[in-house]
Amino acid sequence: MLSRRDLFDARLQLICLDDAGTKDGHSEIDFVDAPSDLVPGVYEGGLKTWECSLDLVDCLHSIYGPDVANKIRGKRVIELGCGTAIPSIYLLHSIFSADPGQSAGDVIVHLQDYNELVLRLVTLPNVILAWYMSPASSAFRASAGTEAEQAEDAEPLPPADPTQPGELPITPGLKAAFLESLRTYRVDLKFFSGSWATLDVDKPGRGPYDILLTSETIYRTASLQSLVDLMRRATSGWARGGSLDEAASRLTLSDTDGLQRLADEPYLCLVAAKLVYFGVGGGVNDFTEAIERPKDGKRLGRVQTVLERNRGVKRSVMRVVWESL
């Protein structure tokens, strides 16, 4: 079970801020209180947790199993349109729950969202909660608990139990302990805001990425090509050698062993989405067509469904295998 910041708490923070910013004539509080979850080009719905991000966690667990922390050691991970970043939080919590003494290589985790506000209000707080609810924060919790008992005005720390609601004070001591854990567990964490077209994944220290994750990002056809281009550039360093058909043939739908074999692939590009986004225009078919049957006739890769949800709103997790460059 994972902890995340409540939207109400984020809203309260904005209300209490005297210098809440604006974007294109909209105040930051407007995004939280908006009746719509989407204001194209202004706010892309990242403050809320959507179903497909949970599907992506299920898929990652099926692929990597309980030893996920060790299996992603030495890898570069990026989550595009991360919002509350639940898939990345799952990976980070797994790392913080493992033995740091067995760390064989750094883990690079990059989180991107259109809105810098989203990164501040929910993404980073959720990352901190993933650490706080793990064994990695035990030393801090023990020392801070003793200090809180000695100081009358100190705020008590909540239990490290995701089933219980609570308020976590962000103190200088907590920030220092969190940063120290990043070093101890060898996690390189970075945040990026802005459109997909502005994210330069070719800069030193960024791509190519071994694991690319994105969920609920293919809902708008107008931005689909920009997303596909970024996904391909972000993993392009691995899309070399071997045939596309050979790579795609290593997995069949509903093949549990096949899902586990994905952990050994050179790169993993996973997209979680609803079959159709009513009222917006995008969906799985448009995404698949943009990759397999683009307008210029040059196939970019192949899209495979690796997980399906047929109850309620139909959803799926897709794996993208790119053509060799």
Summary of predicted features, one role per range:
Residues M1-L325:
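S-adenosylmethionine-dependent methyltransferases
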